[in-house]
């Protein structure tokens, strides 16, 4: 039995359930085949027919056979939505807000119980999603998983443009979870064969900026998406459903970029991005697909720390560059008579480069 059903079943033994509506089987099958429900379950057509989910974690599913039967998963979800509200944060409505919203709309579920979803509500309020940016850090040759670049999403609040507060935004990243110290050959092999679990992580954007532009000297391109606040909110709802949920991670297809395309399909149904990548999902190609889908509103560029330093050093002559290096090691030289003898504009350029 799926672990997410255990608290629900335990409470059912001593608390009455509200009656879930009786939905005709034909309608249930219609909803189970709807592209949006298929996207919420990360289902794809199996090679021998039927369905299989990209999710490799039984905790994600409410039905025992939910991994391969979208209809069974839908029926189990509908039933769980009517569990006693006393479950609180363990209630299906709290665990699956995106499923809940969609089923409520499709079936006009106006009589749902109202559990207190404190954990989810606080998490969503803290992120306060309004818009999204697709971020592309350039290739990093020291990592096999990033030799072709990488993509992540930045989730912005409403005032990010007017107050220039992008550093306070959140970065949504999907990456391989690696335990231990695998050597480079084993790392590459397991990455190619899906030997690592992949997880979503939401971290402050400033941490990713420091990692990419300063520690790894990678340039970043930020593609502002034209998602509405409602579309961005739908995407973040589903991210909550994927919290600590594992996928198999493959460097060349089921990777960071492919998973983000799935999220964009949740945000804006009908854009059909993932079907363009049946074999490989190279980050540069996925960015191009997002552009061709008309999702990009603006492009911003953030140079790496190395590029910034080179640009600052460019107007300096050899002696001034030497001063910049010395000042970087010892700022007390700002009071040196030889430095103070330089023209003020040159002093400013040297300090900027240091």
Segments and roles (model prediction):
Residues 14-16:
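N-terminal signal peptide c-region/cleavage motif recognized by signal peptidases
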Residues 98-142, 147-153, 268-269:
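Gly/Pro-rich turn-and-neighbor structural signature
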